[in-house]
Each structure stands twice: as structure tokens, then as C-alpha cells.
Amino acid sequence: GYTSRTVAQNPPYNFNTEHTWPQSNFGEAEPMKSDLYHLFPTDITANSMRANYPFGKAISNVTWQVGGSKLGNNSSGQLIFEPRDVHKGDVSRSMFYFITRYPVNYGGFFTQTQESVFREWNKFDTVGVVESNRNNAIALLQLKRNPYIDHPEFVDRIYSFATSNTRPTFAELNVLPIKVEFDSTNISEFTTQQIFFANSGT
């Protein structure tokens, strides 16, 4: 979750479930609402602070922070929620899963701005044992896996999650050898030249 706190208390426990993709964006409809891959246990206050704000890096006007998670403004002045460091990768991979599993992009919530941050977090907070075990446990129930937990590198092979844009192509042609020299050849003899073309573009 967002705060990683241990609190001994009597009921009510101030504990609930966070929908990483805000359920208000898809009208609390199933199967999105109960898809465990984007559900995480959380402190009620932290869940309330997150509300349905997008994710990002809080760099100014931080009005709430506990356990490393923050509510504040990003570099564009947008109010966002930043999860603690050890949960950043979990958030990113659950969001990549959700937009892949449910490509409608409910509420237009998955933006290019968030995607850039998620790509960074996917590499910053790599898959650990707990996240991997969680993936295995959920797969037993839902009969499907989060591929971005099994293969985080898949993220780099997808050009855009937020749009339907395709990767632009750039030719980067290399020819070897750079120079070919032709010399004299006797009658009834022949000379062979090899020229290699390699396109290392995209």
C-alpha cells in the first residue's frame, strides 16, 4: 500500500482497499472493480488523500505525506499523488496491466504524462519477491497473469499505452565496405565483391 505502517488498534481498523485505477472512472463496474491486479490494501486516510488524482512526482505544495507517499503538485502545477518509492513499480505495472486488459481507457485516466512517469517507475522500482508471489497467487484465482510483472521489459517494447500511435520508422542504413575498388581481371577469370547493407533503425 501507500504508507507501510504497522498500527495496533481496536475496531474500526481504518483499513480498506485502494483501486489504483479509480473505480469512479469506470462506474464501479465489473470485472474492473474486483480485478485484484490493481487492488491494494491501504490506510483509509491515505486512500482518501489519493482520491482519484492521477499519479506523478510531487515537487511543490505538498499538503499531505506519510510513509513516503505525498499529495502535491507536479512540475506542471497539476495536483497529483505520488506513492512511496517501494510501491512505485507496483503502481506502474498495475496501470500498464489495466490499460492493456481494459483498453477503453476509462475516464481518459491514463494520460501520456502519467505514462512517462510509469515507464520511469517501472525501472526504478523493479519486481521483487512479494510482487512476484502476489502475481502467482492472483493468477490462481483469476486464471490470468500480469505480464508486466513477469516481463517488465515488455513495457519498453510497446511504443505507446496512452495512444494508438505506432512507432515512427527511422532508417539508419550502414553499408560495408565503405569503398569498393575494381581492378583489372584477366579473360576467363572473375572477381567477387561483397557489399553488406544493415538497417539498424526502427
What are these regions (language model features)?
Residues 170-181, 201-202:
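Surface-exposed binding patches on compact interaction domains or structured appendages
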Residues 21, 195-196:
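Compositionally biased, intrinsically disordered low-complexity segments enriched
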Residues 3-167:
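Domain-level detector of nuclease and nuclease-like folds
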Residues 45, 196-197:
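Hydrophobic beta-strand positions in extracellular immunoglobulin-like domains
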Residues 17, 175-177, 192:
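Hydrophobic residues on conserved beta-strands that form the core of alpha/beta folds
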Residues 55, 148, 177-178, 182-187:
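Aromatic-residue hotspot detector
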Residues 186-195:
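Short, solvent-exposed loop/turn segments enriched in Ser/Thr/Gly
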